[in-house]
C-alpha cells in the first residue's frame, strides 16, 4: 500500500466514523493496520474508535500497538490513561496520565518562546 493509498483509507475511515458508520471505519482502520503495521496514526485511530464504542479490550490492544511505536506521544498516553480508567485500574490510568503531562512539559521546555506570552 502506498502512502497516498494509506492516507486515503485513513481519511475515508475518519469520514465514516464522523458519519456514525463505526463498523465501516473499523474495517478500514483494520485494513490500514494490516497493510502498514507501523502506522501510529492508524493504530491510535483504531484505539479511539474502539474506545468510543466501549470495546475496551480492542481499544487497549490497538493503543498498546500505537504506544510501542511512539511511547512519548502525548495523545497515546492520554488515550491509554482513559482506557485504563474505564477498565477500573486507577494506578495504570494515573501512570499514563503522568506520562502525558511529562511529555507536555518537555514540549513546553523545548519551545519556551511560544509559552512566554501565555494563553491568548
Stretches found by the model and what they are:
Residues 18-28, 53-65, 87-99:
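Structural signature of tandem alpha-helical TPR/SEL1-like repeats
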Residues 5-6, 40-41, 74-75, 108:
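Helix-start (N-cap) detector for alpha-helical repeat units in TPR-like alpha-solenoids
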Residues 1-4, 119-120:
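Long, contiguous interaction/recruitment modules in multidomain scaffold/adaptor proteins
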Residues 4-35:
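Alpha-helical segment of the N-proximal tetratricopeptide repeat
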Amino acid at each position: 500500500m502506498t502512502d497516498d493509498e494509506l492516507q486515503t483509507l485513513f481519511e475515508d475511515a475518519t469520514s465514516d466514523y464522523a458519519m456514525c458508520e463505526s463498523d465501516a471505519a473499523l474495517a478500514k482502520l483494520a485494513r490500514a493496520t494490516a497493510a502498514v503495521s507501523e502506522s501510529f496514526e492508524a493504530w491510535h485511530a483504531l484505539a479511539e474508535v474502539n474506545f468510543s464504542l466501549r470495546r475496551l479490550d480492542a481499544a487497549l490492544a490497538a493503543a498498546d500497538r500505537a504506544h510501542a511505536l511512539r511511547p512519548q506521544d502525548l495523545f497515546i498516553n492520554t488515550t491509554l490513561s482513559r482506557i485504563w480508567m474505564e477498565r477500573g485500574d486507577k494506578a495504570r490510568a494515573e501512570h499514563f496520565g503522568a506520562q502525558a503531562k511529562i511529555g507536555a512539559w518537555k514540549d513546553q521546555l523545548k519551545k519556551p518562546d511560544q509559552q512566554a506570552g501565555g494563553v491568548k
